[in-house]
């Protein structure tokens, strides 16, 4: 309706899905202070403050993120936020890529959400929540699974930083060096 009429409007809501669907720009406030302004996509992909990182989307806050494979502790950044889409949960033995970056976990909860399953997994005493497509084999509570966490947001008291899993490296990568030789030359293999 707002688009059809061509008017500017302010819409106040606590429903994130509604806000990101109708807004061209979002302003997130915390106790009367503006935490971040931007398009819904900018805010979702680049949360500036710890409050925004924890507020926008579905998140799990983790204190000991350095116990997760591929993530080293950064000084003064004591907590991390992990979103479900940052996690891949596979049945044991079914992870096709980045096996060296994954770790084993135990499923502690499974919730049917209509178009997906939300799966809570305990990894080294840390519980994280990931999503799993209904097209994949079902996973049950108590089952051992492989968990790959691609990235997370770490934060200090004021700012949020995106951290990628340092263990995620392609396996079986080969490097070729090409040498241009203008004259016949003998190459010895060492």
Language model segments and positions:
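Single conserved hydrophobic/aromatic residue that forms the stacking wall/gate
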Residues: 179-190
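Beta-strand/loop nucleic-acid-binding surfaces
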Residues: 126-137
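SH3/SH3-like beta-barrel fold
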Residues: 119-121
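Short, conserved beta-turn/loop elements at beta-strand boundaries and strand-helix junctions
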Residues: 110-116
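Residues located in well-ordered beta-strands
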Residues: 39, 51, 104-106
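ABC ATPase nucleotide-binding domains
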Residues: 1-48
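Glycine/charge-rich catalytic "coupling/switch" loops of P-loop NTPases
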Residues: 60, 65-110, 136-178
């Amino acid at each position: 309706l707002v688009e059809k009429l061509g008017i500017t409007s302010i819409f106040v809501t606590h429903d994130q899905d509604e806000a990101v669907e109708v807004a061209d720009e979002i302003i997130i406030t915390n106790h009367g202070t503006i935490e971040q302004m931007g398009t819904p996509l900018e805010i979702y992909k680049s949360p500036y403050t710890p409050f925004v990182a924890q507020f926008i989307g579905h998140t799990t806050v983790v204190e000991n993120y350095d116990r997760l494979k591929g993530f080293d502790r950064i000084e003064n950044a004591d907590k991390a936020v992990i979103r479900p889409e940052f996690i891949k949960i596979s049945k044991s033995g079914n992870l096709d890529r980045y096996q060296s970056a994954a770790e084993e976990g135990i499923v502690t909860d499974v919730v049917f959400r209509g178009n997906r399953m939300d799966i809570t997994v305990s990894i080294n005493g840390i519980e994280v929540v990931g999503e799993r497509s209904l097209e994949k084999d079902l996973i049950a509570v108590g089952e051992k699974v492989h968990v790959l966490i691609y990235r997370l947001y770490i934060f200090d008291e004021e700012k949020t930083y995106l951290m990628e899993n340092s263990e995620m490296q392609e396996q079986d990568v080969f490097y070729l060096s090409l040498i241009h030789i203008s004259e016949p030359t003998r190459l010895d293999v060492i």
